[in-house]
């Protein structure tokens, strides 16, 4: 299944706020109410919607998400929490959380177009897994700095999570540590997602 490129507002009306996908918000609380609100949802439907929230927020294909699920399943600790850590430490997500890009798709474009350095080297892979002490900067070109400055100026200025530090004047972000799952900026039940994929993890 490919990455979603359809109407974004349609998704947030059904699933709720997805800040990684779009910075738009429903105009009223009723916009978050699914038309099937009064129909009792099956457990499968509930797990499916949680999985879709995660996939659309981080901009992943079905295959990519399943790959992360399998990696998390082999790691020590809670599979759901490890999954969130893996996704949050992606370079495109780090740029988004720093405010250097307004959405994760926008961050992915910055990386693909080689506007971003990690530890002084160009990285053009959005899924690059950042690690503690990584330093993320704009390439020393006017176009790169302008793109990131525009995003920083337009950013809603949400609190930078504790595992990151932002230097506005140097267009620089620092990864202080692996993210604690409590700092994930998305209302999600990761355990339902693990349950959704439980059979596929075992295959």
From Swiss-Prot:
GO cellular component: plastid; small ribosomal subunit
Segments forming domain S4 RNA-binding: 89-152
Keyword set, alphabetical order: Plastid, Ribonucleoprotein, Ribosomal protein, RNA-binding, rRNA-binding
Signal peptide bounds: none
Biological processes, Gene Ontology terms: ribosomal small subunit biogenesis; translation
InterPro entries: Ribosomal_uS4, Ribosomal_uS4_bac-type, Ribosomal_uS4_CS, Ribosomal_uS4_N, S4_RNA-bd, S4_RNA-bd_sf
Pfam families for this protein: Ribosomal_S4, S4
Matching SUPFAM superfamilies: Alpha-L RNA-binding motif
Predominant cellular place of this UniProt entry's protein: plastid
Molecular functions per Gene Ontology: rRNA binding; structural constituent of ribosome
Subcellular location: Plastid
Keyword Acyltransferase: no
Membrane-spanning segments: none
PANTHER family reported for this sequence: 30S 40S RIBOSOMAL PROTEIN (PTHR11831), SMALL RIBOSOMAL SUBUNIT PROTEIN US4M (PTHR11831:SF4)
Family listed: Belongs to the universal ribosomal protein uS4 family.
Subunit structure: Part of the 30S ribosomal subunit. Contacts protein S5. The interaction surface between S4 and S5 is involved in control of translational fidelity.
Its biological purpose: One of the primary rRNA binding proteins, it binds directly to 16S rRNA where it nucleates assembly of the body of the 30S subunit. With S5 and S12 plays an important role in translational accuracy.
Protein name, per record: Small ribosomal subunit protein uS4c
Species per Swiss-Prot/TrEMBL record: Orobanche minor
Lineage: Eukaryota, Viridiplantae, Streptophyta, Embryophyta, Tracheophyta
Protein encoded by which gene: rps4
């Amino acid at each position: 299944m490919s990455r979603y490129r359809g109407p974004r507002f349609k998704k947030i009306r059904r699933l709720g706020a997805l800040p990684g996908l779009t910075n738009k918000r429903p105009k009223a609380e009723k916009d978050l109410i699914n038309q099937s609100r009064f129909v009792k949802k099956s457990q499968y439907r509930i797990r499916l919607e949680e999985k879709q929230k995660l996939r659309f927020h981080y901009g992943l294909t079905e295959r990519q998400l399943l790959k992360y699920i399998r990696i998390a399943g082999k790691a020590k600790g809670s599979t759901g929490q490890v999954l969130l850590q893996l996704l949050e430490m992606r370079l495109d997500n780090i740029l988004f959380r720093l405010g250097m890009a307004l959405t994760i798709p926008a961050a992915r474009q910055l990386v693909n177009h080689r506007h971003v350095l990690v530890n002084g080297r160009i990285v053009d892979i959005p899924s690059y897994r950042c690690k503690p002490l990584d330093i993320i900067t704009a390439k020393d070109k006017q176009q790169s700095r302008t793109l990131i400055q525009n995003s920083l100026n337009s950013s809603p200025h949400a609190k930078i999570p504790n595992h990151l530090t932002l230097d506005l004047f140097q267009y620089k972000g620092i990864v202080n540590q692996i993210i604690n799952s409590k700092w994930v900026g998305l209302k999600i039940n990761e355990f339902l997602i693990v349950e959704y994929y439980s059979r596929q993890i075992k295959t």
